[in-house]
């Protein structure tokens, strides 16, 4: 581990992560611009919401670290469900819960209340995936976490635009 830090500061667990190419911006279609046409929420729209979330450890986005990918986002607008699988950069990443919480908060703040959200670790990619997934699925634990001023501040830093 080396010194440095992103949002949390301190020592880095993954001092040299792989950095991936960002996908291009999605072109806006005429149908999407027409306010008279109902515009359903799709996987790309959800990915666009979460791709720029900052990693808590590195000055990079979750997309640049390949923690989130559009192929791991599933949406059913008619059923009002969104599922996002994310992949921590290392199997013992201690930031996995914070990353999942940041994704969940971004979706909670961005989507209509009718949506049921499932944010979870991509199966087989983290040593504690079941424990982390259980925490992220527990509405009371998520609500309690967001009442913690320090934790909410860290989540907000992950969600803020980098300068």
Swiss-Prot record:
Subcellular location as annotated: Nucleus; Cytoplasm, Cytoskeleton, Spindle; Midbody
Database matches in SUPFAM superfamilies: Fe-S cluster assembly (FSCA) domain-like (SSF117916)
GO BP, sorted A to Z: chromosome segregation; protein maturation
Domain of life: Eukaryota
Keywords for this protein: Chromosome partition, Cytoplasm, Cytoskeleton, Nucleus
Subcellular location, principal: nucleus
A single cellular component GO annotation: MMXD complex
Annotated PANTHER family: CYTOSOLIC IRON-SULFUR ASSEMBLY COMPONENT 2B, CYTOSOLIC IRON-SULFUR ASSEMBLY COMPONENT 2B-RELATED
Subunit structure: Component of the CIA complex. Component of the MMXD complex, which includes CIAO1, ERCC2, CIAO2B, MMS19 and SLC25A5. Interacts with CIAO1, ERCC2 and MMS19; the interactions are direct. Interacts with KIF4A; the interaction facilitates the transfer of Fe-S clusters to KIF4A to ensure proper localization of KIF4A to the mitotic machinery. Interacts with CCDC117; the interaction is direct.
Biological function: Component of the cytosolic iron-sulfur protein assembly (CIA) complex, a multiprotein complex that mediates the incorporation of iron-sulfur cluster into extramitochondrial Fe/S proteins. As a CIA complex component and in collaboration with CIAO1 and MMS19, binds to and facilitates the assembly of most cytosolic-nuclear Fe/S proteins. As part of the mitotic spindle-associated MMXD complex it plays a role in chromosome segregation, probably by facilitating iron-sulfur cluster assembly into ERCC2/XPD.
UniProt record similarity statement: Belongs to the MIP18 family.
Name listed for the protein in its UniProt record: Cytosolic iron-sulfur assembly component 2B
């Amino acid at each position: 581990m080396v010194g440095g830090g992103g949002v949390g500061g301190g020592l880095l667990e993954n001092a040299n992560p792989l950095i991936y190419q960002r996908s291009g911006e999605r072109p806006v279609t005429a149908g999407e611009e027409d306010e008279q046409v109902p515009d359903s929420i799709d996987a790309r729209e959800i990915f666009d919401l979460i791709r720029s979330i900052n990693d808590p450890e590195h000055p990079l986005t979750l997309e640049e670290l390949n923690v989130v990918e559009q192929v791991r986002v599933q949406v059913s607008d008619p059923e009002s469900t969104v599922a996002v699988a994310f992949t921590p950069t290392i199997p013992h990443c201690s930031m996995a819960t914070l990353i999942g919480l940041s994704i969940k908060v971004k979706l909670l703040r961005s989507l209509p209340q009718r949506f049921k959200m499932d944010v979870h670790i991509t199966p087989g990619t983290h040593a504690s995936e079941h424990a982390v997934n259980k925490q992220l699925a527990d509405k009371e634990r998520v609500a309690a976490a967001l009442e913690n001023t320090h934790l909410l501040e860290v989540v907000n830093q992950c969600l803020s635009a980098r300068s």
